[in-house]
Amino acid sequence: KAMASTTKIMTCILALEQREIKEVVTVSENAVRQLRVHLGMQIKEKFYLEDLLYSLMLESHNDSAVAIAEHVGGSVKEFAKMMNEKAAEIGCQKTYFITPNGLDASDENGKHTTTAEELAKIMRYCIQISPQKESFLKITQTQSHAFTDVDKKRQFSCNNHNAFLGMMDGALSGKTGFTGDAGYCYVGALRRGERTFIVALLGCGWPNNKGYKWKDTKKLMEYGLQNYEYHNVLKKQKNITIPVKNGVPSNGELFGEAVIEGRVKTNAKRLPFLIRQGETVDIKTEIPTMLQAPVPKGKVIGSVTYFLKDFQIQRYPVIVTETIKEKTFLWYLKKIFELYALK
């Protein structure tokens, strides 16, 4: 579905990761002609990137989004490419960005869309994984921000429209959105102790139902708090024995069979994950039935993956614990010579 201005969480985190916040952004004609809601920029006006990020996230200004995109990517099209690359890196497969502001758009490859699950993944990246997560949280938690253009000719002020920040203890971050295609949208995060919950809503009502997103967010957050707790889902895995074709056996016998052990490569003692009572975590082991010599010590030969239904929690590589050499022609020749020499 269309996601409207919730798009701007990706615009913000990309700008934070790619550029310095004190860089000067020069406004283009393309940015100026963006539809409302807008800051009201003027062509060739200059702003600090940091101030435009507050404009982007607090007031959801569409002209600021385009100015940021053009500064970071060189053009809106190139910035959208960066957005899609980052989305793929995060693990999104059904998200497609065309604009940096979330205005309804389509091109030869499809419409500007995402899913609620993938929007939540992007928010998780912004607040928990990105090297700029603290900067992202600082901006999105700020209640108001005043600034001027670089030349100090005009003054501006922005106020945070994320009502969720005042609705629940631990409310952490969020972004609203609305377009005709998207309806009212919201993505927000809450943290209580070690637990972090993210809610993503798409098409959550149309006018006159602006308040639905707040009610639904609170209801879903309360459900998460009441029903989900951290559990250590890590299971101790035994080493796996695998035959090695044409490998030199450990006893060195001419007709002996070589085997090798594979172990899960991790030093982790715990794998904490939020699950509901009654839910079970599945473990999928992918190991070949046979290896081909030579096999160097430490080679990755498979994986052990933890799943909750279709969601991948964690994947660990399986490596071999020793080196197995190949039975070469020279090795056979040497062995035959040794046999005859002993007679």
Describe the predicted segments one by one.
Residues 1-134:
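Active-site-adjacent loops and short helices of periplasmic peptidoglycan-processing enzymes
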Residues 110-343:
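Domain-terminus/edge residues, biased toward the C-terminal soluble/receptor-binding domains
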